[in-house]
Amino acid sequence: MDVKRPKKIFTRSQIIDLIADGKVIVIYKNNVLNLTSWIKKHPGGDKAAYHMVGKDATDEMHAYHCDETVDTFTRFKIGEIEGPRWENLLPPIQGGIYAKGGHYGSLNNKNTSNKKTLDSKLDNDSSNSTSDLECLTTTNSCDSDISETEIANYKGIGFVPSVKPVVPQNQLVSKSNMDIVFPIIDEETKKKVIRNPKTLLNNYDNKLSQEDVMSLPALDYDSQQVLRDKYNELHQTIIDYGLYECDLWDYVREVTKIGSLFLYSLSFLKINQLFLSAVFMGMAWHQGTFIAHDAGHIGITHNYQIDNIFGMLIADWFGGLSLGWWKRNHNVHHLITNDPVHDPDIQHLPFFAVSVRLFQNVYSTYYDKILPFDKFSQFLIPLQKYLYYPILCFGRFNLYRLSWTHVLCGQGPRQGKAAWFRYFEFFGLSFFFYWFFYLLVFKTIEGGWNRFNYVMVSHITTMLVHVQITLSHFAMSTADLGVSESFPSRQVRTTMDVDCPEWLDFLHGGLQFQAIHHLFPRLPRHNLRKAQPFVIKFCEEVGLSYSIYGFGEGNEIVISRLADIGKQCSIFLDATKHYEGDLY
């Protein structure tokens, strides 16, 4: 007779202890999952999982994984949480610091006598006094000292000492305390002159954060749970309507379209019409990007190996770009969308900045390095509204660099079912550079100037996809509103859709429905338009603002945001000329 083992119940303090030991602990449907031994095998990359440490990742895990994968989650179960609902911890990669005994900690404090448990500090919203908040944010007297061993453990799960969260650890943001969490120093009311240029930046950024707090549903866990429940109902509706079922004939047409563009390019090359040949080559790459995107999200056959092989053939072998690099980058982007410190899709210094936080030498947790706001950045950012389109013309060359770095440095999974992709991609990228740069450009086209023009025209033609990618996020919120904000709230808040007629869908390749895509990343591209009415209704019911603009108007909004950030840069640089303190 089988004896059923009693459930292992983990208290909040016990889970904190595990994280303090460097364990990759994620909450899924009230189950405690320990992903530590498996993290290097994660096909989506280790960074994506690190951003879920200490959090209830149920919605994210369902959105990004098929049913077959979901069924494997319980293999990593080590117990269940105490209580009916989990309230998120700040992941160490985002600045969360924890010490043994269920305490939050400090890197500097030597006095361990003033420890406070996380339970006692959790959910201090309107009742939290100014002095209490200052204790959390500006002093070490409330914090527990962390040993060198614990720091080493943290580094194993993405922790970097220089990363500081905007919202204090375990602080719940609300309309009543937003003036404390996001303070704005007013010269007139405070009767003081702002001398520190960083205060100018913080005022600007905090004002935007306050506007977000006022426009969104309340960020307390009860309100966000209502939103999550509605989102799960929406997800079930999407499933019930069969929108996850992909019509493979759609992709037969896509491949035929790309093949036709490629053949046109070769035909024009044959008759020495180099300009037209280059344009059609760029158009083929442009359309191929959309298929690679769909395949990377396992949104075609929903079979991991088949979709990835298909995607790598299109991205690497035909387009010269690493699908593995894109997946590692893109998965983080989806989970921590538009965060200047964590989202690589808005980390484009020295060329672009969409948040003033990037003026402060932030440490990128994705690139594992400081993004310096150096003299070159200081020269370009005030001009970014003028340089936006010209710089995007050269975007594909940067993707070559990132692709080769990813493959040669082995930044993708080195274990598990995705480990062999690295070698397939290496040969794919090599093959692309052989057939395009050597056979087609060097061996077929005569004259150095003609070769140069061909390469430039073909690559500049793909500029449109870079416009489409940045259009979705560059003008949207970059605020950090704390760990209580739900997955659907963050995705809708940070993403813009593009209104276009159905006959023009082929040109946008699904990127016109980015808000819908961010809510349901595996949804086949050709079904996104069918899902739009359901998403609009959902946003109306829960009080989220669904942002959608025409392509022209959306571009105007992006340019306006770039101009505004550029203006703030000029103000900041002017203020630094009269400031003698340490900015960083």
Curated annotation (Swiss-Prot):
GO cellular component: membrane
UniProt xrefs under InterPro entries: Cyt_B5-like_heme/steroid-bd, Cyt_B5-like_heme/steroid_sf, FA_desaturase_dom, Fatty_acid_desaturase
GO molecular function: metal ion binding; oxidoreductase activity, acting on paired donors, with incorporation or reduction of molecular oxygen; oxidoreductase activity, acting on paired donors, with oxidation of a pair of donors resulting in the reduction of molecular oxygen to two molecules of water
E.C. number: 1.14.19.18
Motif (Histidine box-2): 330-334
Gene ablation phenotype (knockout): Has a decreased hyphal growth rate and is highly sensitive to SDS and fluconazole.
Name of the protein in question: Delta 8-(E)-sphingolipid desaturase
